[in-house]
Amino acid sequence: MARGNGIERVVADNRKARHDYFIEETYEAGVVLTGSEIKSIRAGQVNLRGGYVRIVNGEAWLYDVHIAPYEQSGKYFNHEPTRPRKLLLHRREISRIAGQVERQGYTLVPLRLYLRGSRAKVEIGLARGKKLYDKREDIARREARRTIDRALKERARH
């Protein structure tokens, strides 16, 4: 049995995606990486902002996710920071996601990258873009919740 198999450690979180999109569904996918990439991920040198997923020839690919070059490896053994990376999903999941992405206005975005045991996993979300007024509604809702919480906290003190 693999040690630490159930332990999950979040390495990178894409909070901007949750701000810019309505997340309809989420999927977990493995990522095909090189040795220097997994070492950089373990060091926490990942940026998911601006990343996206595309289905090409029945395979899911992760684009524009920046994994910094590993410091200790030489210049010949290092990787390209923003290269496309293949995602590991079941064939059924890929075909289902592809059907949903073909609908107008939907896209796939990486939400978080984490380590489960020794494996790197990425949580991708089927997302629909938010309009400016949707973002303003969310901000107003958060502000209202914050003022209510403040009032309740103040009331509990007295």
UniProtKB/Swiss-Prot annotation:
<dbReference type="InterPro" id="IPR000037">
    <property type="entry name" value="SsrA-bd_prot"/>
</dbReference>
<keyword id="KW-0694">RNA-binding</keyword>
<dbReference type="GO" id="GO:0003723">
    <property type="term" value="F:RNA binding"/>
</dbReference>
<comment type="function">
    <text>Required for rescue of stalled ribosomes mediated by trans-translation. Binds to transfer-messenger RNA (tmRNA), required for stable association of tmRNA with ribosomes. tmRNA and SmpB together mimic tRNA shape, replacing the anticodon stem-loop with SmpB. tmRNA is encoded by the ssrA gene; the 2 termini fold to resemble tRNA(Ala) and it encodes a 'tag peptide', a short internal open reading frame. During trans-translation Ala-aminoacylated tmRNA acts like a tRNA, entering the A-site of stalled ribosomes, displacing the stalled mRNA.</text>
</comment>
<dbReference type="GO" id="GO:0005829">
    <property type="term" value="C:cytosol"/>
</dbReference>
<protein>
    <recommendedName>
        <fullName>SsrA-binding protein</fullName>
    </recommendedName>
</protein>
<dbReference type="InterPro" id="IPR020081">
    <property type="entry name" value="SsrA-bd_prot_CS"/>
</dbReference>
<comment type="similarity">
    <text>Belongs to the SmpB family.</text>
</comment>
<keyword id="KW-0963">Cytoplasm</keyword>
<dbReference type="GO" id="GO:0070929">
    <property type="term" value="P:trans-translation"/>
</dbReference>
<dbReference type="InterPro" id="IPR023620">
    <property type="entry name" value="SmpB"/>
</dbReference>
<dbReference type="Pfam" id="PF01668">
    <property type="entry name" value="SmpB"/>
</dbReference>
